[in-house]
Amino acid sequence: MPSTLQALTKKVLATQPVFKDDYCILERCGLWWHEAPITIHHTCIDKQILIKTASFKHGLTLNVALMKAVQENNHGLIELFTEWGADISFGLVTVNMECTQDLCQKLGARKALSENKILEIFYNVQYVKTSSNIILCHELLSDNPLFLNNAQLKLRIFGELDTLSINFTLDNISFNEMLTRYWYSMAILYKLTEAIQYFYQRYSHFKDWRLICGVAYNNVFDLHEIYNKEKTNIDIDEMMQLACMYDCNYTTIYYCCMLGADINRAMITSVMNFCEGNLFLCIDLGADAFEESMEIASQTNNWILINILLFKNYSPDSSLLSIKTTDPEKINALLDEEKYKSKNMLIYEESLFHIYGVNI
């Protein structure tokens, strides 16, 4: 909560509609950054405060805005963001002048950050899904010694990227590059168009990485764009295998299938990764590798998958196979995760209802 009446007044003022005639008032009040007014907005889900300016039009969290203000040694904004609720400890991540460090400590920051606090800061800043936030986090943190030397963070990022590193070895790249790839992947996961373009333009040699993340994170729009824009060294069956490692990746599985990927291999991969939803989609798309899939399910004693594979009354879904499109708009409308229900899953569930008398 704001600690002074003045800070509260500024907070109320920053939430109001901004007109050009009011710019001089906002500038005098300190609600001015990078030659533009500061406004306050809130995230839809958890109502976090977002700071917006012309430079950060999609919004920054208070803590990320504070880190940027500290980097710029903007003492007025450091005090304002702290009064609005930012954690002054975050400022120690980007502090570069003794006078600014003194101000941070005066406002309550410790002299140094512990390894656990550094990890906490990383977890805190990464989850707000705006292009401005992702881009600035990359710029402030990817080459930051505090994060490059954090052993726990290295393990976390290594684990996040390990499954996706199908065409390179993580041991052969720097941690700075790992962090860059991580922020790039977050932009694709959250479907942040401006952030994706930012990374694409600056890291053109990561074109395969963009495609990999598009497949893995079910972003069929970005997958389609990059697949048709760039030559890739990744085989279509490799793409399908990656798509099948994450359940409910319906749009990218369908896209790879339409490009000619082996749907039986996709079925087997789905079983290997315990992806029930993907398994049913593969059956809808004509997969019939039941013997191989049953052998894998039996080895792991996965009775849910075993029972699904024992059922005999499956057939391809002609409504999916007849369309034959790689248009992401059409694919998304056809296989929207919240609306799509597999024809063969419905048949299987109906059979269970007849056996047990309850909906599964």
Curated annotation (Swiss-Prot):
A GO biological process held by the record: taxis
TM stretches of this protein: none
Keywords (A to Z) from UniProt: Early protein
Protein's UniProt keywords contain Signal: no
Entry's induction text: Expressed in the early phase of the viral replicative cycle.
Disruption phenotype: No effect on virulence.
Family: Belongs to the asfivirus MGF 360 family.
Function: Plays a role in virus cell tropism, and may be required for efficient virus replication in macrophages.
Name the record gives this protein: Protein MGF 360-1L
